[in-house]
Amino acid sequence: MASLLPFVQTRSNTVNFFMRRSGPELWKTLTSVSKSGQKKGRRNTRQPVRPLNRFYRIGSSPMKIEFAGLNAPIRMRETENQNLMSIAEQTEDEIRDSMGGTKKILEERDTGKKKRNREKLHPMERGFSGTQLVGQKLGAPPPLDGVNFDDFETYCLEVKRTSNMTNVFGRVHTMSALVVTGNGRGLAGYAVGKAPIHRTTTAIINGMGMASRKLFHVELHEGRTIYQDFYAECRNTRVFAQRRPRGFGLTCHPRLIKICEAIGIKDIYVKVEGSTKNYLALTHAFVTGLLNQETHQQLAERKGLHVVEMSPSRHFLPQIVASPISTELKTEETLEALDRLNLDDFYGEGRYPLRKPKSLPFFSNLEGHLDARWRKHPFRNQESTMIRLIADNMVPRWTRDARAAWADQRNERMTTGVEPMPLGIGLSHVVPKKDD
C-alpha cells in the first residue's frame, strides 16, 4: 500500500571546507610565513592564534538557552511535546559566574604575565627621550685597580646598533654605547663600549670601565668656563665655543650639555655647524678644543706680554691677569702686528660662526612705514641720552619718591596761594558762556 505522505527529497550537505579541515589547519592558513618571508621580516607582522573557544562557544549564553539538536539532545519519544528552545533553571550563583566568566579569564591572563615595574623618574633626571637610558645619570664607574670613582658621574650619550661583515659568520650585529664620565672639577673621560646584539646594559658597563681608564684634565677659568673662545672640528662637525659671564648657563647641543656637566663647565655657548647627529665626532671635536686651550699664564709666557682684562664693572680700566715669569717682557719697539690682536681674534684659526642677519619685515620699504620713521627721526637719541645723563648724575633720577616729593611741594604752594589752583580737568581756566 503506498504511503499518502508526499515524498520530499532534500539534500543535507554538511561536508564543506570548514568541516574537512581542523582548527589548527585553518589557523595555519592565516599565521604561516614562508622561508623567504621569514628572512624579510614578515614573521613579526602575523597575528597570533586566538583561543576563541575560551571566550565564546556556539549556542552558549549566560541565560543557558537550550536548543534541541545544537547544545541539547533530541528526545525521539518526546519530539511532539518537546520545545525546540527552552531556558534552563539556574541559581543566582550560577548566573553570576556565567556573567563574569569572560572577565575572569581576562584577569587570569593579565595576572599571569610579569609586569615590569619601572621606577618613576623625576623630570630633571630623565634622559633625552622618555624612559631611555640615553642622557640619564648612571652613577659612578666601577673601581679600577683599587681606585674608587665615588665622586664621578656617568652619562650615556648614544646607544646604537652596528654591523660588521665577516667571511665566516656573515653580517655580525653588535651594540655600541658612547659614555662620558667626570667628577665635575675638570677631570673626565669618554669611551665607546661594545657588546653583542640586544645587550645594551653590557655595552654601557663596558663603556664606563673604558672611560674610567682614559681620563683627561681640562683647565677651567674661575672653575666655571673656558679660558678663550676656540674652534675645533672632526669629520663634518664644526664646533665654535665661546666663554660667557657668570650665571649665563649652558647654551649648546644636548650632548654637549652632559659633557659640560661631567667636566664642570657652568657657563658656555657652543655653536655646532655641519653634522649634528654624529655624536662621537661631536664629542671628539669639543674635547679636542678643550685640551688645546692654554691658560692666561701660559699665554703670557709664550708671547712675553701681560694678559690684561678690561671689564665694564671697573670702567674698562686695565687689570693685569697674568705676567711672564721665565720669559723676558717685550717692549713697545719689539712688538709685532700679530701681538696686537684682541684675545677674541687671537684664537680660532681665523674662523667665526655663521651669524645670519635678521631678515627685514615685509613693511620695511612701504611708504607709511618710511614716513613714520621720518617723523620719529628727530627723537632718535633721546632715550640713550637720558640714560647717559642719569648714569653720569647730570640729571636726578625721577623715582617714585622724587615724584611724591614734587607733588607734595606743589600741593603746599597751591594751598598757600603761591600758585593758582587749576580749574577743571586739565584746563588752565574756565571761560564762562556768554548770555544771548
From Swiss-Prot:
Pfam families xref list: Ribosomal_S5 (PF00333), Ribosomal_S5_C (PF03719), Ribosomal_uS5m_N (PF21251)
One GO cellular component term noted in the UniProt record for this chain: mitochondrial small ribosomal subunit
Domain S5 DRBM: 152-218
Alphabetically ordered keywords of this record: Mitochondrion, Ribonucleoprotein, Ribosomal protein
Region (Disordered): 417-436
SUPFAM superfamilies the UniProt entry points to: dsRNA-binding domain-like, Ribosomal protein S5 domain 2-like
Major localization listed first in the record, in broad terms: mitochondrion
Organism: Caenorhabditis elegans
Subunit description: Component of the mitochondrial ribosome small subunit (28S) which comprises a 12S rRNA and about 30 distinct proteins.
An MF annotation (GO) of this entry: RNA binding
Organism taxonomic ancestry: Eukaryota, Metazoa, Ecdysozoa, Nematoda, Chromadorea
Similarity comment text for this entry: Belongs to the universal ribosomal protein uS5 family.
Keyword Mitochondrion: yes
Subcellular localization: Mitochondrion
Cystine pairings recorded for this chain: none
GO biological process: one example: translation
Protein name stated in the entry: Small ribosomal subunit protein uS5m
InterPro entries, per the entry: Ribosomal_Su5_D2-typ_SF, Ribosomal_uS5, Ribosomal_uS5_C, Ribosomal_uS5_N, Ribosomal_uS5_N_CS, Ribosomal_uS5m_N, Ribsml_uS5_D2-typ_fold_subgr
